[in-house]
């Protein structure tokens, strides 16, 4: 059986876990972090970030309608869930990569 020896073992690679890991590593501690799914935690992967992107995307319909009063002509303002979902997932992937890079550069 493998043996592991860490000064700090963190469960969860969300914002708090990543910050704790980076700070401990900066203090010279040997740190490991475990994550069930993806780096970034609930906020980045399933909660805050996707929700904010959805709310932001939903505001465009009203903006397009209001723009007509200012000379803008948008005839085919059609929402595509597939295009939006792809863009949203690319942004989540980008943020996850940042978390991963922060941990790697901190020797975690």
Question: Where does each model-flagged region fall?
Answer:
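Glycine-rich flavin
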Residues: 3-6, 22-29, 34-108
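Beta1/beta-strand and adjacent pyrophosphate-binding region of the FAD-binding site
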Residues: 2-16
């Amino acid at each position: 059986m493998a043996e592991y020896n860490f000064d700090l073992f963190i469960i969860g690679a969300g914002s708090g876990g990543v910050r704790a890991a980076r700070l401990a590593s900066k203090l010279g501690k040997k740190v490991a972090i475990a994550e069930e799914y993806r780096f970034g935690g609930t906020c980045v992967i399933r909660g805050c970030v996707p929700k904010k992107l959805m709310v932001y995307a939903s505001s465009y319909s009203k903006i397009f309608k209001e723009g007509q009063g200012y000379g803008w002509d948008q005839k085919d303002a059609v929402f595509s869930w597939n295009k939006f979902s792809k863009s949203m997932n690319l942004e989540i992937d980008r943020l996850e990569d940042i978390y991963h890079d922060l941990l790697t550069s901190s020797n975690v």
